[in-house]
Amino acid sequence: APPIQRGHWGYDFALQLVRASVTRFHRIQGVDGFENITDPKTPTIVVANHQNGLMDPLVLVSLVNNSQVHWLTRADIFYKKLTRTILFSFNQMPIYRQRDRLSDARERNAKIFEICAERLRIGARMGLFPEGNHRAMKSLRPLRRGVSDMVNASLKLDPSMRQLQILPVGIDYEEMPSFRR
Protein backbone atom coordinates (compact mmCIF):
# COMPACT_ATOMS: atom_id res chain seq x y z
CA ALA A 1 0.00 0.00 0.00
CA PRO A 2 1.37 3.41 -0.90
CA PRO A 3 2.08 5.62 2.11
CA ILE A 4 0.43 9.01 2.42
CA GLN A 5 2.87 11.80 1.71
CA ARG A 6 2.30 14.96 3.69
CA GLY A 7 3.95 18.21 2.69
CA HIS A 8 6.12 16.53 0.04
CA TRP A 9 8.48 19.14 -1.45
CA GLY A 10 8.25 17.53 -4.90
CA TYR A 11 4.48 17.88 -4.90
CA ASP A 12 4.66 21.49 -3.75
CA PHE A 13 7.22 22.32 -6.45
CA ALA A 14 5.27 20.48 -9.17
CA LEU A 15 2.06 22.20 -8.07
CA GLN A 16 3.63 25.63 -8.60
CA LEU A 17 4.79 24.57 -12.09
CA VAL A 18 1.35 23.17 -12.90
CA ARG A 19 -0.43 26.33 -11.77
CA ALA A 20 1.94 28.53 -13.79
CA SER A 21 1.58 26.32 -16.87
CA VAL A 22 -2.20 25.99 -16.68
CA THR A 23 -2.70 29.74 -16.38
CA ARG A 24 -0.09 30.41 -19.08
CA PHE A 25 -1.42 28.05 -21.72
CA HIS A 26 -5.12 27.85 -20.88
CA ARG A 27 -7.62 30.57 -20.23
CA ILE A 28 -9.90 29.30 -17.48
CA GLN A 29 -13.32 30.91 -17.67
CA GLY A 30 -16.66 30.20 -16.12
CA VAL A 31 -15.49 28.57 -12.92
CA ASP A 32 -18.63 28.27 -10.81
CA GLY A 33 -19.34 26.62 -7.48
CA PHE A 34 -16.15 27.27 -5.54
CA GLU A 35 -18.35 28.23 -2.61
CA ASN A 36 -19.37 24.56 -2.49
CA ILE A 37 -15.84 23.31 -1.88
CA THR A 38 -15.86 22.19 1.70
CA ASP A 39 -13.47 22.50 4.58
CA PRO A 40 -10.21 20.70 3.70
CA LYS A 41 -10.75 18.28 6.61
CA THR A 42 -14.09 17.05 5.26
CA PRO A 43 -13.66 13.75 3.40
CA THR A 44 -14.43 14.49 -0.24
CA ILE A 45 -14.43 12.53 -3.49
CA VAL A 46 -13.80 14.79 -6.50
CA VAL A 47 -15.57 13.27 -9.52
CA ALA A 48 -15.06 14.76 -12.98
CA ASN A 49 -15.57 14.00 -16.63
CA HIS A 50 -12.41 13.10 -18.53
CA GLN A 51 -11.86 14.77 -21.90
CA ASN A 52 -8.14 15.42 -22.10
CA GLY A 53 -5.81 12.83 -20.54
CA LEU A 54 -3.25 14.40 -18.24
CA MET A 55 -4.61 17.93 -18.61
CA ASP A 56 -7.84 17.24 -16.68
CA PRO A 57 -6.25 16.41 -13.31
CA LEU A 58 -3.72 19.23 -13.76
CA VAL A 59 -6.48 21.79 -14.26
CA LEU A 60 -8.37 20.48 -11.22
CA VAL A 61 -5.27 20.40 -9.01
CA SER A 62 -4.43 23.97 -10.00
CA LEU A 63 -7.89 25.13 -8.90
CA VAL A 64 -8.20 23.32 -5.55
CA ASN A 65 -6.09 25.57 -3.36
CA ASN A 66 -6.42 24.25 0.13
CA SER A 67 -5.68 20.53 -0.07
CA GLN A 68 -4.02 17.87 -2.12
CA VAL A 69 -6.18 15.55 -4.21
CA HIS A 70 -5.23 11.86 -4.07
CA TRP A 71 -5.93 10.54 -7.58
CA LEU A 72 -6.80 7.07 -8.74
CA THR A 73 -4.72 6.49 -11.86
CA ARG A 74 -4.77 3.67 -14.38
CA ALA A 75 -2.58 0.85 -13.09
CA ASP A 76 -0.50 0.18 -16.19
CA ILE A 77 1.59 3.32 -15.68
CA PHE A 78 2.66 2.08 -12.23
CA TYR A 79 4.60 -0.87 -13.67
CA LYS A 80 7.90 1.02 -13.99
CA LYS A 81 9.66 1.55 -10.67
CA LEU A 82 10.66 5.20 -11.20
CA THR A 83 7.18 6.19 -12.40
CA ARG A 84 5.58 4.29 -9.51
CA THR A 85 7.83 6.07 -6.98
CA ILE A 86 6.94 9.48 -8.41
CA LEU A 87 3.21 8.72 -8.56
CA PHE A 88 3.17 7.38 -4.99
CA SER A 89 5.00 10.51 -3.80
CA PHE A 90 2.13 12.54 -5.29
CA ASN A 91 -0.43 10.35 -3.47
CA GLN A 92 -1.68 8.66 -6.62
CA MET A 93 -2.85 5.07 -6.48
CA PRO A 94 -3.38 2.44 -9.17
CA ILE A 95 -6.85 1.45 -10.29
CA TYR A 96 -7.17 -1.75 -12.30
CA ARG A 97 -9.47 -1.76 -15.31
CA GLN A 98 -11.12 -4.67 -17.09
CA ARG A 99 -8.94 -4.05 -20.11
CA ASP A 100 -5.87 -4.79 -17.94
CA ARG A 101 -7.02 -8.43 -18.10
CA LEU A 102 -5.87 -9.38 -14.63
CA SER A 103 -7.72 -12.27 -13.05
CA ASP A 104 -7.51 -10.61 -9.62
CA ALA A 105 -8.33 -7.03 -10.70
CA ARG A 106 -11.44 -6.86 -8.48
CA GLU A 107 -9.47 -8.01 -5.43
CA ARG A 108 -6.72 -5.50 -6.14
CA ASN A 109 -9.26 -2.71 -6.53
CA ALA A 110 -11.02 -3.77 -3.32
CA LYS A 111 -7.70 -3.27 -1.49
CA ILE A 112 -7.19 0.12 -3.17
CA PHE A 113 -10.71 1.19 -2.17
CA GLU A 114 -9.93 0.20 1.44
CA ILE A 115 -6.86 2.45 1.30
CA CYS A 116 -9.01 5.23 -0.20
CA ALA A 117 -11.52 4.77 2.61
CA GLU A 118 -8.77 5.07 5.20
CA ARG A 119 -7.48 8.24 3.55
CA LEU A 120 -10.99 9.70 3.40
CA ARG A 121 -11.48 8.85 7.07
CA ILE A 122 -8.52 11.06 8.00
CA GLY A 123 -9.84 13.90 5.80
CA ALA A 124 -8.09 13.40 2.45
CA ARG A 125 -9.65 14.33 -0.86
CA MET A 126 -9.80 11.52 -3.39
CA GLY A 127 -10.17 12.16 -7.10
CA LEU A 128 -11.28 9.98 -9.96
CA PHE A 129 -12.72 10.06 -13.42
CA PRO A 130 -15.61 7.57 -13.39
CA GLU A 131 -15.81 7.38 -17.17
CA GLY A 132 -12.71 5.17 -16.98
CA ASN A 133 -10.98 6.67 -20.02
CA HIS A 134 -10.65 9.98 -21.82
CA ARG A 135 -12.00 11.22 -25.13
CA ALA A 136 -12.42 14.63 -26.66
CA MET A 137 -16.22 14.46 -26.55
CA LYS A 138 -18.70 17.11 -25.48
CA SER A 139 -20.88 14.59 -23.69
CA LEU A 140 -20.67 12.42 -20.61
CA ARG A 141 -19.84 8.79 -21.35
CA PRO A 142 -21.09 5.80 -19.34
CA LEU A 143 -19.79 5.78 -15.78
CA ARG A 144 -17.91 2.95 -14.10
CA ARG A 145 -18.63 1.82 -10.57
CA GLY A 146 -15.54 3.23 -8.83
CA VAL A 147 -17.31 6.01 -6.94
CA SER A 148 -19.93 3.69 -5.45
CA ASP A 149 -17.24 1.14 -4.53
CA MET A 150 -15.23 3.85 -2.77
CA VAL A 151 -18.28 5.12 -0.86
CA ASN A 152 -19.26 1.58 0.17
CA ALA A 153 -15.72 0.80 1.35
CA SER A 154 -15.66 4.05 3.33
CA LEU A 155 -18.97 3.38 5.07
CA LYS A 156 -17.93 -0.19 5.80
CA LEU A 157 -14.68 1.05 7.39
CA ASP A 158 -16.37 3.73 9.44
CA PRO A 159 -20.19 4.04 9.49
CA SER A 160 -19.84 7.55 10.95
CA MET A 161 -18.48 8.75 7.58
CA ARG A 162 -21.91 10.03 6.65
CA GLN A 163 -20.32 13.47 6.18
CA LEU A 164 -18.47 12.10 3.12
CA GLN A 165 -19.09 14.48 0.22
CA ILE A 166 -19.02 13.85 -3.51
CA LEU A 167 -17.94 16.95 -5.42
CA PRO A 168 -19.04 16.72 -9.07
CA VAL A 169 -16.94 18.73 -11.51
CA GLY A 170 -17.67 19.36 -15.18
CA ILE A 171 -14.74 20.16 -17.46
CA ASP A 172 -15.41 21.67 -20.87
CA TYR A 173 -12.63 22.83 -23.18
CA GLU A 174 -13.46 25.28 -25.94
CA GLU A 175 -10.36 24.42 -27.94
CA MET A 176 -8.61 21.37 -26.59
CA PRO A 177 -5.77 20.95 -29.06
CA SER A 178 -4.64 24.57 -29.12
CA PHE A 179 -2.70 26.44 -26.48
CA ARG A 180 -2.99 30.10 -25.61
CA ARG A 181 0.01 32.14 -26.78
What are these regions (language model features)?
Residues 6-181:
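Soluble catalytic domains of membrane acyltransferases
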